A protein has these predicted regions:
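Active-site-facing alpha/beta catalytic cores
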Residues: 92, 102-103, 107-352
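Long, contiguous, compositionally biased segments that the model treats as domain-scale units
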Residues: 14, 22-170
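Anionic group-transfer/hydrolysis microenvironments
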Residues: 99, 139-141, 321, 379-381, ...
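Single conserved hydrophobic/aromatic residue that forms the stacking wall/gate
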Residues: 1-12, 397-402
Length: 402
């Protein structure tokens, strides 16, 4: 079952102790508050793409503070998403994930959040009608403040500074102070993620996501002459809506939608500090988001990022590139979903249209032969970009995965 992940392709990046996979983590900069509730032992594993914080005591204070704060999401919500991801793995639902390549503190405004949410809801309405299938709506939002970098440092005019690793780590300005990793930024990221989730809940529970309202947005979209070709499709949805209303469908029941958050579990200290025990079941949940994924650079089956996620009950994803071997995929299933529970593991392909037909089939066959269920998600943005205004990467929707 192929589902869809959309994110913009802005060239925003992140840093770590060193680029690439497999470099052991510098334990001297990690905090010592490693409670026994975390059985996974990720600190003893190689951990790439981590910031080098200059003050270990300050890092320890920040993570202790984070551990004392309320969860951003709740176990019941996570379980609901897991059930919907299980339906998608069986072909009974379609997953739509959208949001920024990397969020910024500057754009953490009500208007930016509303517009991203609106776009995802509009797309979900069209997909639901076109496929006659429920759509699982996930925002790459409320926590996507970090992203891996290919180089640990950046040099300009003979000056070398740490790379910009996202707003939860350092600042984009090219000065020594701005580029020095600051653990207090994780607290800022936590607070901004909380306000984003609060606003999303208000929108999706308060009538803003009403199906009739979402359809009216799509009608406005087709008023643009550039999109006239979609007008007939909008008319079909319009007729279906009128039929539902005439047939007595309770539209009040369609005023609310389930909307979930996701981000890359990149900053190990932050994710570890956000793990909580569910009082109902005793299970561990990473309460920074409903769904977490590990990236192409950090997905080593025995490495720290995968090890951390083995210990939590959230649905998790793994980015899969064109150079991934079938044995790599099976090893990841062994680590992240050894008992084969539907809804637990998603494989997110990031291959580009040019390499997809060659690289993906062997991986699909390996998963099929293994027999344990996964939810397939395709990222049509990666590898299909063009350079738009101001050197920003963008993607034409008609050039995505075939």
């Amino acid at each position: 079952i192929y589902t869809l992940s959309l994110h913009d392709a802005l060239p925003i990046s992140i840093v770590g102790a060193g680029p690439g996979r497999g470099r052991p983590y510098d334990a001297s900069v990690m905090n010592e508050l490693d409670p026994p509730r975390i059985p996974a032992g990720w600190r003893a594993r190689p951990a790439s793409q981590q910031p080098v914080y200059p003050d270990a005591a300050e890092l320890a204070a920040v993570t202790a503070d984070l551990r004392s704060r309320p969860p951003l999401v709740f176990a019941g919500e996570v379980d609901s998403l897991r059930a919907q991801m299980a339906a998608a793995s069986r072909g009974r639902a379609f997953v739509l994930m959208g949001g920024d390549c990397a969020e910024t503190f500057r754009e953490n405004t009500a208007n930016h959040i509303r517009l991203k949410l609106q776009t995802i809801l509009q797309m979900a309405a069209v997909l639901t009608y076109g496929a006659s299938t429920p759509v699982v709506k996930i925002g790459r939002m409320a926590g996507q403040y970090a992203k891996p970098r290919s180089r640990a440092d950046e040099t300009r005019d003979g000056v070398t500074l740490p790379s910009y690793r996202g707003d939860s780590v350092n600042d984009h300005a090219f000065t020594p102070r701005a580029r020095t990793p600051d653990p207090r930024r994780m607290l800022d990221a936590y607070l901004r993620a909380g306000t984003t989730l609060n606003l999303i809940r208000s929108f999706t529970m308060g009538g803003y996501a009403d199906l009739r309202e979402v359809h009216s947005w799509n009608r406005g979209f087709t008023a643009n002459p550039a999109y006239k070709r979609f007008e007939a499709f909008a008319e079909e949805i319009d007729r279906a809506m009128r039929f539902m209303e005439a047939a007595g469908v309770d539209f009040d029941a369609l005023r609310q939608v389930d909307f979930y958050s996701a981000h890359e579990a990149l900053l190990l200290e932050y994710e570890d500090a956000m793990i909580r025990v569910d009082s109902r079941s005793g299970r561990l949940y990473d309460t920074s988001a409903h769904l977490l994924w590990v990236g192409e650079r950090t997905r080593g089956p025995q490495d720290a990022h995968v090890t951390l996620l083995t210990g939590v009950h959230n649905p998790v994803g793994v980015k899969i590139g064109p150079d991934t071997a079938p044995d790599d995929v099976v090893a990841l299933i062994d680590r992240l979903n050894p008992t084969g529970e539907a809804g637990r593991l998603s494989l997110i392909t990031r291959m580009g249209a040019d390499r997809l037909r060659e690289a993906l089939p062997p991986l699909v066959e390996a998963v099929r032969a293994d027999g344990r269920p996964v939810t397939w998600i395709t990222d049509p943005m990666h590898g299909n970009t063009i350079t738009a205004d101001k050197d920003r990467k963008s993607t034409r929707l008609n050039s995505s995965h075939p």
